[in-house]
């Protein structure tokens, strides 16, 4: 539920579409819907190359209340590396979607 007059929290959602064995992304759409219902304004970035999760997090992460990444251990590592470059670090969430998850 979102209350009128209460500013929405901002969430940066980084998705690695190449992670894991499955091609179904329905759970990720469900996650975005859940965050939205919880009062977050969600910005989704789909990575296209290695290192991009780190770069996106380092450049934009400081403007968000929470950064959530969906991917494998490499995506999580990149996102953490990007967060370490920030003076003010937002909360971190992880949706494991790697080949061993």
Can you annotate each of these PLM segments?
Residues 9-101:
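Small-residue-rich beta-alpha loop regions that form the catalytic core of phosphotransfer
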Residues 1-7:
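Short, Lys/Arg-enriched N-terminal segments with co-localized hydrophobic residues
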